[in-house]
Curated annotation (Swiss-Prot):
Its cofactor is Mg(2+). GO terms for molecular function: fructose 1,6-bisphosphate 1-phosphatase activity; magnesium ion binding. This is Fructose-1,6-bisphosphatase class 1. Homotetramer. Binds 2 magnesium ions per subunit. It catalyses: beta-D-fructose 1,6-bisphosphate + H2O = beta-D-fructose 6-phosphate + phosphate. Gene3D superfamilies: 3.40.190.80, Fructose-1,6-Bisphosphatase, subunit A, domain 1. Mg(2+) 1 binds at residues 91, 113, 115. InterPro entries: FBPase_C_dom, FBPase_class-1, FBPase_N, FBPtase. It comes from Bordetella avium (strain 197N). Belongs to the FBPase class 1 family.
Amino acid sequence: MKRKTLTQYLVEQQRSAQALAPEVRLLIEVVARACKAISHAVGKGALGGVLGSLESENVQGEVQKKLDVLSNEILLEANEWGGHLAAMASEEMETIHRIPNRYPKGEYLLLFDPLDGSSNIDVNVSIGTIFSVLRAPHHVSGAEVSEADFLQPGRDQVAAGYAVYGPQTMLVLTIGQGVVGFTLDREMGSWVLTHEKISIPADTKEFAINMSNMRHWDAPVKRYIDECLAGKTGPLGKDYNMRWIASMVADVHRILTRGGIFMYPWDAREPGKAGKLRLMYEANPMSFIVEQAGGASINGTQRILDIQPEQLHQRVSVILGSKNEVERVGRYHSESLT
């Protein structure tokens, strides 16, 4: 049986009760093409002269990798001329990128982390691109877009997805109608539907967290991890395995494939920050995907998708994955407040 391509899937979704606006379909296809270009650059590695770091830092205060900058440029250049967007925002840029006046403007906003997990670039571990699509507020149609127009809760996302650059390059996508996965056919140059109706089991025996930071976590997270480590003889009554790749895309992709819970909690070393991960570029799109796959995502006490953003580069604590495990951690946080 012939497999569907990304274009075929999106056209079918567009025709199906108008579940997908034509502009969003075209926008997703452009993002997917940009991800192919990034995949090619990642795949060349040292042969393409793209490994290593630059002397510059991004707005987060992180030293930029060469591929961070290249991936950001690829996404900007691919998306600014198509007429689907009013503006873009990137984890790598301090301010928003408005569509130049020489190009037509559309009704949507695109946010992205051009290369998540870039600390793994030089050691050849899976990395990825995360993106989120929002509708621009009606009042900005034909007007100047501002940063405030991006500050919408995650539940308002129109689409979200990520590309993972590993042994195979995959694109995982939701438009609010479940989660599907496409594999890049490198010979044909097309995205092919290989994973339909992706779902996360409600229970798990795997957790993903950086255990070296355990002494810095708050009590509810420590309690849950202690119970996982206690195994069959502990209160959870089962043995757990720990996994940690230090690439959110890779860790979440594994959870979508076989279940698990991913945790990047608040850290006492930076008590003034709500967390490490970025709400708009990482937590919101990944939470949308995880919820559409039957999982859950919280910051400890609140559903991630209900958080009202206050800043473009806002950070947040993230606990997502198998629903029953996430809800357990949420209960522990609630109990700690009483």
